[in-house]
Amino acid sequence: MSGLLVAGTTSDAGKSAVTAGLCRALARRGVRVAPFKAQNMSNNSMVCRGPDGTGVEIGRAQWVQALAARTTPEAAMNPVLLKPASDHRSHVVLMGKPWGEVASSSWCAGRRALAEAACRAFDALAARYDVVVAEGAGSPAEINLRAGDYVNMGLARHAGLPTIVVGDIDRGGVFAAFLGTVALLAAEDQALVAGFVVNKFRGDSDLLAPGLRDLERVTGRRVYGTLPWHPDLWLDSEDALDLQGRRAAGTGARRVAVVRLPRISNFTDVDALGLEPDLDVVFASDPRALDDADLIVLPGTRATIADLAWLRARDLDRALLVHVAAGKPLLGICGGFQMLGRVIRDPYGIEGPGGQVTEVEGLGLLDVETAFSPHKVLRLPRGEGLGVPASGYEIHHGRITRGDTAEEFLGGARDGPVFGTMWHGSLEGDALREAFLRETLGLAPSGSCFLAARERRLDLLGDLVERHLDVDALLNLARHGCPPTLPFLAPGAP
């Protein structure tokens, strides 16, 4: 089998971007390439169609990487998805379907079954594609987790994958991170680490060159290239490390405030708003930051009831009520929409202790009620909203009942300036986004095309990878494996 593992010195080092860029570069060469991540921990996910026609759920990053590879996204590309519901509890999605939940204290108990499923998924992809580019998670040097690892070096050992390590030089300390990562690995794992990729470099490459030569000399491994920091490069974000917002280039922009919930999910829903030239998009957790917002978005969450309590504890509920009382628009998406209703019920303990009926009062801005069901809805709806075609994707346990005063809106409800939808991704549709901004803010169509913008970003990423990395050498590495003479670096992990 031919493949490559893209590991990193830390979380957010750039593994997802490098994987996507390699997928696009290899696809341009006519290579049938697939992305893979054995286990992803993220509340940003996507629905794609399974082999039986039903919806399956994978990490958003792997979905985008499949687009970069110009192939069809599928559950095998992210066989295990962990969706954090609290600091100590995660819901598990296995091969695209709900599998159960795990607590951090009992995580090791069910890990073998997940590891076996992940390895089977990789093997199935490797049998159908020329090359599989696998993305690691966090750092492979988490030596306390080595025994049960199946996403970093555990996967590399299973499939004999040569590994490159990505480091973010913008954070500082990248040389120590590279050396320390390799040195902490066991000998059999070090033998699979072929070299390094420096990411997010700004400055004079001549000043960097001596350090790269010393790194190659000390480690006995090559540097496959240095990717520059680029201001226009964004991808659908994998986790909550990228809640930065986007500013309009000109003056006089309208302000969109997205409430930064503790368990925010699918915050890529607002990426399309960030493309609009007349909008500033900011994330806010302070009620004062909502005072001058022209539009507020209450996004999805993996813990609707807990995040509603957080909202009230911070007095953000009052800020939302004041905003709506002033006639200004408010959009709730999935869990955010459910908060806008009259009541939320959790009779099966989906978000709380099993068997305990939980009922909380909503914000009362929409005449709807929500009841959580054990069955998870995963689907790709199409329809109409505001007089134009619309589409999106649904990932939820909530069942909505609309009252007499609620007008239907994209699987949700509308009442005056308050909109609620169960459809993630609806604003990525240009016609729906233009109609919504015209209805709520009086904005004329900008002509922005979200799908074209995403494709341009993927092409830009592919261009950067081809220009700054030795793609031919990496493809040769994927096909033929590591050289047999890589040195062992002390101390090594026991």
From Swiss-Prot:
Gene3D superfamilies reported in the protein's UniProt record: 3.40.50.880, P-loop containing nucleotide triphosphate hydrolases
Gene Ontology BP annotations: cobalamin biosynthetic process
Organism (species): Mycobacterium tuberculosis (strain ATCC 25177 / H37Ra)
PANTHER family in UniProt: COBYRIC ACID SYNTHASE, DETHIOBIOTIN SYNTHETASE
Swiss-Prot/TrEMBL keywords: Cobalamin biosynthesis, Glutamine amidotransferase
SUPFAM superfamilies in the cross-refs: Class I glutamine amidotransferase-like, P-loop containing nucleoside triphosphate hydrolases
Keyword Transport: no
Positions annotated as active site in the UniProt record: 334, 424
Name of the protein described by the UniProt record: Cobyric acid synthase
Any GO molecular function: ABC-type vitamin B12 transporter activity
Pathway entry: Cofactor biosynthesis; adenosylcobalamin biosynthesis
Protein role: Catalyzes amidations at positions B, D, E, and G on adenosylcobyrinic A,C-diamide. NH(2) groups are provided by glutamine, and one molecule of ATP is hydrogenolyzed for each amidation.
Family to which the UniProt record says this protein belongs: Belongs to the CobB/CobQ family. CobQ subfamily.
GATase cobBQ-type domain ranges (all copies): 253-432
Annotated gene: cobQ
Keyword Lyase found: no
InterPro entries (alphabetical): Class_I_gatase-like, CobQ/CobB/MinD/ParA_Nub-bd_dom, CobQ_GATase1, CobQ_N, CobQ_synth, GATase_3, P-loop_NTPase
